[in-house]
């Protein structure tokens, strides 16, 4: 009887431990997923191509980014590391996501060329690591970096506050204040410095 009781206690303890360790329940795209706890997580410091959710055409390599994210984390336990700002304006948890082997998913997506860096102050703990990984992917011309822009502009306007850059005709670019306004001669130069393309004008 005592042996059965001890076995039952051990089983309950193991089940409790398993339930307490969060795993990835669903992957939405290249930089967003949901945990078994119900929390939605947005990866810090990266911006993956957008998947078509509104009837528009999905961005280049958007589905490939989601597939890699799913391959890395779907159904697996992960460790989350937070930064200074805990949630975004949508209420999603902002995190660096680590696999059991210690690899950071945010960095792996950038290194494979399936996400761009997007610094978001004050969450800048790993910004240098992510930018170094992006520069390597750019130099190797893999993923998003394998092709040049279809309609290049003479210059691009960057915002040093949001780390987004825009076409000269973009209203968002025109409204950037002088102290945050940065000019780039090419998309490549802007991305090399860690700026990410505007979602509206899509440079």
Language-model features and meaning:
Residues 2, 7-8, 13-203:
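Small beta-barrel nucleic-acid-binding modules, primarily SNase/OB-fold domains
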């Amino acid at each position: 009887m005592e042996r059965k009781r001890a076995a039952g206690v051990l089983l309950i303890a193991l089940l409790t431990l398993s339930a307490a360790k969060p795993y990835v329940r669903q992957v939405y795209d290249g930089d967003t997923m949901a945990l078994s706890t119900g929390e939605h997580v947005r990866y810090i410091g990266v911006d993956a191509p957008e998947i078509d959710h509104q009837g528009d055409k999905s961005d280049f390599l958007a589905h490939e980014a989601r597939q890699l994210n799913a391959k890395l984390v779907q159904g697996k336990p992960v460790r989350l590391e937070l930064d200074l700002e805990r949630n975004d304006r949508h209420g999603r948890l902002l995190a660096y996501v680590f696999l059991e082997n210690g690899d950071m998913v945010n960095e792996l997506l950038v290194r494979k060329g399936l996400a761009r860096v997007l610094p978001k102050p004050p969450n800048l703990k790993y910004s240098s690591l992510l930018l170094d990984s992006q520069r390597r992917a750019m130099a190797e011309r893999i993923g998003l970096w394998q092709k040049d822009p279809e309609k290049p502009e003479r210059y691009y306007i960057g915002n040093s506050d949001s780390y987004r850059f825009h076409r000269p005709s973009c209203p968002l670019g025109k409204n950037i204040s002088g102290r945050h306004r940065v000019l780039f001669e090419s998309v490549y130069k802007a991305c090399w410095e860690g700026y990410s393309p505007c979602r509206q004008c899509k440079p």
